[in-house]
């Protein structure tokens, strides 16, 4: 083994099952070593995954050492056998990189080679994520005599979408007798919604005579065939009533420079024989045309198109429970319709209805509060005070959120951030079960080894797995034990988003602030919580470092003003990072005349961008409503950042009144520089 890699692998007795692993290799060296593993290490076997570079200092006597070594290699590569992935994932649920390893496991299955029993066991715990995965499950079930289950899985594979041509042939050779004409039509429809035209061309001959003409027209549209206009001319009502045809026709119109025609068609309710099989594609179709209309200043048309969201779902569908991509397009449409009605069309009642749909579709407290707050504002504009009060009450339930805090002010009260304290008894058995989870043991082992970066991955996994109030409390205790306030933030957010209680104290941990910066105590916490979640070793994709995420160049320029010597290696030291971050923020506050909104925006986007926005958007300190100014910030990241930091500051002030930056009956409005509540 090359001495250049500086790697020493030291295996203890196989009987004990312990793996001694000492590593001092760079990531590049570690990757090189993975590539040098012998072929035998890549073959499936009923044993743990091959040993590989793990956390540098985890003790070989620590029970977490061996699984950490396995996790380290499996998460870095795709070249290992299915059994390696499956055995690890079955034994170590909720570990980091689970989704990545699940996908690799599905790709690694070798039909006729890998154990059918292991394949079935794996998919029972981790359901297939792709049509190919369903096919592998079907083949495994057929191999062990589970014929009915195999036929169902094969049908899911066939109707689920895209398969390779080889897998298409494998499925048809084994299961074609179990597939009906309806199954073939369903697959064709799915492929067309996916815009998978090559696979759809292969599928066309399997479709039923009744549906084939419509599929031929849709395929011609999606491929922009020369005869597409002729086929359109002969498309009869059964075809034109198909939502798949409508979506493909709109796509073709936009693709051939006829977007205006598409808008005119979409602005009116279209008769359809069914609801679209792909709400996501349907909503995206509406969104593109509505946005095009808005860009051209056609606000009534933009509203008309965006308000057709009801065509995407069967009545009564809980949009909040639909996949993110669907919810995202749906809320974009309702927001566009609502703001067009309120700000452009002088139709506040219609705006209130759209804001209400937006709030009801939203999953996160942040988005729900935003929708309810603006629904309240729209109801007020429409003269409906009772409906406005109820909307503000709905928003005020989210007292740690920007718009929930504004709603509380509208109702004449302070945001209630202390109401959810709970005391859930934890039994010794519950505590022992939690602490003995392999993901918790691994997280603690990495902490003992001083491996902060990899421990951070486990911190996130533990936070995401919290599902009960008891687990919430235990995870919060673990955060304190491990010295990981970022785990507290993540656990608290997950508890909030999952509807659990008592998250406020957990989600807003406290850190030590240098005495000279105590006057900025709340805003320091507010920025650090948003920037790094209090992860002192955080490094952003652009190189910002530490609690307050300082770019090295900014830190270098700020150090003399803070009375400090610049040292890049110290940016991960909390006190040093806070001193520089607080000094830089103080300079921004001075530069912008004490405006928290502008200083916070500049901390995120830079003073140059903020100065440009002051020229193009107006000045929220003078001639522009501050809420409208924030909504008009062209960078979505900065728009979100300003709201999150200021809502954090309000919570920290309320939870720690002796250290509050702002003491007011309208705290958020005070931070915003507004003269009116809410």
Residue ranges and their predicted role:
Residues 15-27:
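Bacterial N-terminal signal peptides
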Residues 56, 81-89, 115-125, 149-158, ...:
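Alpha-helical repeat scaffolds
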Residues 93-94, 127, 142-143, 147-163, ...:
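TPR/TPR-like (Sel1-like) alpha-helical repeat modules
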Residues 39-43, 60-68, 78-82, 93-103, ...:
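Generic helix N-cap/helix-start motif at coil->alpha-helix transitions
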Residues 31-79, 417-438, 448:
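N-terminal leader/linker segments that initiate helical-solenoid repeat arrays
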Residues 109, 141, 191, 220, ...:
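Residue at a conserved register position within TPR or TPR-like alpha-solenoid repeats
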């Amino acid at each position: 083994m090359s001495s250049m890699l500086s790697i020493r692998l030291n295996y203890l007795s196989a009987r004990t099952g312990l793996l001694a692993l000492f590593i001092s290799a760079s990531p590049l060296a570690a990757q090189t070593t993975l590539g040098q593993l012998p072929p035998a290490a890549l073959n499936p076997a009923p044993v743990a995954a091959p040993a590989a570079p793990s956390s540098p200092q985890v003790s070989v006597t620590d029970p977490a050492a061996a699984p950490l070594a396995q996790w380290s290699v499996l998460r870095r590569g795709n070249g290992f056998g299915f059994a390696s992935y499956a055995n690890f994932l079955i034994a170590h649920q909720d570990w980091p990189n689970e989704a990545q390893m699940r996908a690799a496991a599905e790709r690694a299955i070798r039909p006729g080679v890998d154990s059918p029993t292991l394949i079935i066991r794996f998919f029972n715990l981790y359901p297939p994520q792709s049509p190919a995965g369903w096919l592998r499950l079907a083949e495994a079930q057929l191999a062990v005599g589970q014929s009915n289950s195999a036929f169902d899985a094969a049908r899911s594979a066939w109707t689920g979408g895209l398969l390779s041509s080889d897998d298409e042939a494998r499925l048809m050779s084994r299961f074609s007798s179990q597939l009906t004409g309806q199954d073939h039509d369903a697959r064709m429809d799915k492929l067309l919604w996916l815009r998978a035209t090559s696979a759809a061309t292969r599928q066309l001959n399997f479709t039923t005579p009744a549906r084939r003409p419509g599929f031929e027209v849709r395929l011609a549209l999606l491929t922009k065939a020369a005869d597409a206009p002729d086929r359109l001319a002969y498309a009869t009502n059964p075809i034109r009533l198909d939502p798949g045809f409508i979506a493909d026709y709109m796509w073709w119109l936009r693709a051939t420079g006829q977007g205006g025609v598409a808008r005119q068609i979409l602005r009116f309710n279209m008769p359809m024989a069914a609801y679209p099989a792909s709400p996501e594609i349907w909503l995206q179709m509406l969104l593109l045309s509505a946005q095009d209309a808005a860009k051209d200043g056609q606000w009534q048309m933009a509203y008309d198109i965006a308000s057709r969201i009801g065509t995407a779902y069967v009545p009564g569908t809980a949009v909040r429970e639909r996949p993110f991509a669907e919810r995202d397009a749906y809320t974009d449409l309702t927001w566009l319709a609502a703001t067009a009605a309120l700000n452009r069309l002088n139709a506040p009642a219609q705006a209130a209805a759209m804001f209400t749909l937006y709030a009801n579709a939203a999953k996160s407290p942040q988005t729900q509060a935003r929708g309810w707050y603006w629904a309240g504002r729209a109801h007020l504009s429409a003269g409906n005070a009772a409906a406005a009060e109820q909307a503000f009450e709905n928003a005020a339930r989210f007292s740690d959120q920007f718009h929930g805090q504004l709603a509380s002010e509208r109702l004449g009260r302070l945001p209630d951030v202390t109401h959810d304290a709970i005391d859930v008894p934890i039994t010794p058995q519950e505590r022992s079960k939690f602490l003995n989870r392999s993901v918790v043991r691994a997280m603690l082992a990495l902490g003992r080894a001083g491996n902060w970066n990899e421990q951070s991955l486990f911190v996130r996994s533990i936070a995401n797995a919290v599902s009960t109030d008891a687990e919430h409390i235990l995870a919060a205790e673990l955060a304190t034990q491990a010295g990981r306030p970022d785990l507290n933030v993540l656990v608290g957010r997950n508890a909030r988003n999952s509807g659990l209680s008592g998250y406020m104290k957990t989600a807003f941990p406290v850190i030590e602030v240098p005495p000279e910066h105590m006057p900025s105590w709340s805003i320091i916490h507010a920025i650090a919580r948003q920037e790094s979640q209090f992860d002192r070793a955080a490094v952003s994709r652009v190189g910002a470092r530490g609690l307050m995420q300082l770019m090295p160049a900014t830190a270098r320029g700020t150090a003399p003003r803070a009375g400090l010597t610049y040292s890049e290696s110290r940016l991960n030291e909390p006190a040093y990072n806070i001193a520089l971050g607080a000094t830089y923020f103080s300079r921004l506050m001075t530069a912008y005349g004490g405006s928290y909104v502008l200083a916070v925006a500049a901390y995120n986007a830079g003073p140059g961008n903020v100065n440009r926005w002051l020229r193009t958007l107006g000045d929220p300190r003078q001639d522009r409503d501050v809420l409208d100014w924030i909504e008009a910030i062209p960078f979505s990241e900065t728009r979100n950042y300003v709201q999150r930091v200021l809502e954090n500051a309000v919570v920290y002030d309320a939870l720690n009144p002796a250290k509050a930056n702002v003491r007011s009956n309208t705290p958020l409005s005070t931070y915003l520089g507004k003269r009116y509540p809410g």
